[in-house]
């Protein structure tokens, strides 16, 4: 029996699932840290902070940077300089700086993963409504989808500012299913992190976990999605469609 035979719609996470956004996010984080004369983190470290929205990203970046600066100053025999500066105020300033810099680098620092456009096109052609659920700040979402030429595939888009509770809370997924006019158990959710899988489970949606995204350095199988795929186009045969690589061969 096909586990997904009752699926009537598919929703996707964005960062780490459809797009590699780490270069742009890391650049904006580091520019914001540098502007506050804090140590810069680098892409490899920033990747481990992605997934819970910009506010949490700033909190993680600031916590690391303050600790890193304190350690460096201690090794130099210098006193700490952050004790009298409220972390909450620094997070607020860091977020403003991040938003400014990310608006400048988001498009050039974000790339579609392989087979994404073909997979979305095949699902849309099958008549399945497609949704997007991301914790990314809403103002960045639509311009990015347009720049990547994938906005046309989605009938419902939920950004991080569109709901009070972000993933892993089920609210964003439940809202997408409601707008699609289907039950949560009829909507497949595809993501790359434990937040995605936890949200799907809480909403009652079947889930696909992808192995290539930003899952805090954890293997996606630890979150126990219903199915694990190495590539996004592995989703197509499970939904009764030819694999996109096979489809491309037919079109050549």
From Swiss-Prot:
Keywords: Carbohydrate metabolism, Chloride, Hydrolase, Magnesium, Metal-binding. It is an enzyme of class 3 (hydrolase). The active site is at residue 13. Mg(2+) binds at residues 13, 15, 192. PANTHER family: PHOSPHOGLYCOLATE PHOSPHATASE (PTHR43434:SF1). Pathway: Organic acid metabolism; glycolate biosynthesis; glycolate from 2-phosphoglycolate: step 1/1. It comes from the Bacteria. Specifically catalyzes the dephosphorylation of 2-phosphoglycolate. Is involved in the dissimilation of the intracellular 2-phosphoglycolate formed during the DNA repair of 3'-phosphoglycolate ends, a major class of DNA lesions induced by oxidative stress. GO terms for cellular component: cytosol. This is Phosphoglycolate phosphatase. Its cofactor is Mg(2+); chloride. Its EC number is 3.1.3.18. Monomer. It catalyses: 2-phosphoglycolate + H2O = glycolate + phosphate. InterPro entries: HAD-like_hydrolase_sf, HAD-like_sf, HAD-SF_hydro_IA, HAD_sf, PGP-like_dom2, PGPase_prok. One of its GO terms (biological process) is DNA repair. Belongs to the HAD-like hydrolase superfamily. CbbY/CbbZ/Gph/YieH family. GO terms for molecular function: metal ion binding; phosphoglycolate phosphatase activity.
């Amino acid at each position: 029996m096909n586990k997904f035979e009752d699926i009537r719609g598919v929703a996707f996470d964005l960062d780490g699932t459809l797009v590699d956004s780490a270069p742009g996010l890391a650049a904006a984080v580091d520019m914001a840290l540098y502007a506050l004369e804090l140590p810069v983190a680098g892409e490899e470290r920033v990747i481990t902070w992605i997934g819970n929205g910009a506010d949490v990203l700033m909190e993680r970046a600031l916590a690391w940077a303050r600790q890193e600066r304190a350690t460096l100053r201690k090794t130099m025999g210098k006193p700490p300089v952050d004790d009298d500066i409220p972390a909450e105020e620094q997070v607020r300033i860091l977020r403003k700086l991040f938003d400014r810099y990310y608006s400048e680098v988001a498009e050039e620092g974000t790339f579609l993963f392989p087979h994404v456009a073909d997979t979305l096109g095949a699902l849309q052609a099958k008549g399945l409504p497609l949704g997007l659920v991301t914790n990314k700040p809403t103002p960045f979402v639509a311009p990015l989808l347009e720049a990547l030429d994938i906005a046309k595939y989605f009938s419902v888009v939920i950004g991080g500012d569109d709901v009070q509770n972000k993933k892993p809370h089920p609210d964003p997924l439940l809202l997408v299913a409601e707008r699609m006019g289907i039950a949560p158990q009829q909507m497949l959710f595809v993501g790359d992190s434990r937040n995605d899988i936890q949200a799907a489970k809480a909403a009652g949606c079947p889930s696909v976990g992808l192995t290539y995204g930003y899952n805090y350095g954890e293997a996606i199988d630890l979150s126990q999605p219903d199915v694990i795929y190495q590539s996004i186009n592995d989703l197509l045969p499970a939904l009764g469609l030819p694999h996109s690589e096979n489809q491309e061969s037919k079109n050549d």
